[in-house]
């Protein structure tokens, strides 16, 4: 059986960059994933949109670990939430469980706690800071580990957009907590998540460690990273491919939106074909510069029929896509840093239950959002246009 036969109906794309026609070329190369052929899933996913529910589930999983724990987070704060995780990790390490914790040195820079880190190490937890500042290699500091992963005994994995901090807790932070999304699943995906964790932990690019199996026809979900020597645009290609193949709707949620040519072109083309293309972004971005860059992309999208909504009540941090029967959940924003620079990880699935749960959550979010009107947008003042220009010029640092 040929490789293309094994891949079934998979359609694959060379991730070579920005040309508007490049995402239409199909090659037999699974490292450049376009539209994989997955079987329909059976509802084995748990979706979390409240930090308290997620943290309780993660800590319960940590407490039940028997062999090993792998935790990776962009932000680990020395607050009540971080303290709960630290205690659980330390307890399991003292019980003989192999506990490894990899967190980003810049993401956690604003909430440092030497005492907390020392307590973890004293308990036997292995810690690593990803890309701390180095005068010898300053350029490395601009590539971050933005992934959020917890793997328990290579049997269960949690991943998504939630960091470990109090701002995600309704109980501790109140109604102003962040709006985010995470997913939990057991089985083969946990083993593959462990492989990806190990690859970054060991700073290796092992060719034998591949998150995408040879044959995807019997797989209901994939973990797709954007770190590959052969393809530096895997996530952009994935989104552009699914949007280009859409037949009914495209519902995107992202806190930072600075699309590359492939994604922007695919969204506009889909809207012109009559597809219901919607984009949900925050009204108030943090930092404000990110909002300027996001709004710089509005006009061409609106003119082609893309509907844009701005989320109002609180900070939006979720990164999800619901495209016909497909769902994507993970750590990646639709911006330059997430698509092309940082380490990210997303789950892509073809599961009716997961799709409906995320689609319903999207519709609920739209009830708390304001739609951007093209006629009113075209009347915006000189100051808005000026700061959009600044955002457009600096979009590659987002």
PLM regions: where:
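Charged, low-complexity intrinsically disordered terminal segments
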Residues: 2-398
């Amino acid at each position: 059986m040929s490789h293309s036969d094994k891949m079934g109906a998979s359609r694959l794309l060379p991730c070579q960059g920005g040309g508007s026609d490049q995402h239409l070329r199909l090659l037999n190369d699974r490292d450049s994933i376009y539209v994989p052929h997955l079987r329909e899933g059976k509802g084995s996913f748990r979706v979390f949109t409240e930090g308290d529910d997620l943290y309780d589930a993660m800590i319960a999983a940590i407490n039940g670990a028997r062999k090993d724990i792998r935790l990776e987070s962009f932000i680990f704060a020395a607050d009540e939430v971080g303290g709960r995780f630290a205690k659980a990790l330390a307890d399991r390490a003292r019980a003989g469980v192999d506990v490894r914790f990899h967190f980003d040195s810049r993401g956690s820079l604003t909430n440092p706690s030497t005492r907390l880190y020392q307590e973890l190490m004293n308990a036997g937890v292995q810690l690593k800071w990803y890309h701390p500042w180095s005068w010898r290699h300053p350029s490395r500091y601009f590539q971050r580990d933005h992934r959020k992963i917890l793997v328990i005994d290579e049997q269960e994995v949690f991943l998504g957009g939630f960091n470990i901090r109090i701002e995600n807790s309704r109980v501790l932070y109140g109604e102003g907590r962040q709006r985010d999304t995470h997913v939990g699943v057991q089985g083969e995906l946990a083993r593959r998540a462990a492989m990806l964790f190990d690859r970054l932990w060991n700073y290796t690019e092992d060719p034998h460690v591949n998150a995408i199996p040879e044959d995807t026809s019997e797989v209901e979900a994939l973990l797709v990273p954007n770190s590959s020597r052969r393809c530096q645009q895997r996530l952009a290609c994935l989104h552009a491919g699914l949007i280009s193949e859409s037949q009914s709707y495209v519902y995107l949620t992202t806190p930072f939106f600075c699309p590359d040519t492939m994604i922007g072109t695919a969204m506009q083309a889909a809207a012109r074909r009559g597809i219901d293309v919607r984009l949900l972004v925050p009204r108030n971005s943090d930092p404000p510069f990110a909002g300027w860059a996001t709004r710089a992309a509005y006009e061409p999208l609106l003119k082609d029929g893309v509907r844009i909504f701005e989320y109002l009540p609180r900070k939006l941090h979720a990164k999800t896509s619901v495209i016909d029967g497909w769902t994507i959940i993970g750590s990646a924003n639709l911006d330059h840093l997430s698509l092309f620079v940082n380490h990210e990880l997303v789950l892509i699935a073809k599961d009716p239950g997961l799709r409906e749960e995320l689609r319903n959550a999207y519709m609920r979010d739209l009830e708390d959002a304001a739609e951007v009107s093209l006629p009113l947008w075209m009347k915006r003042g000189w100051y808005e246009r000026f700061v959009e220009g600044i955002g457009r010029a600096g979009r590659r640092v987002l």
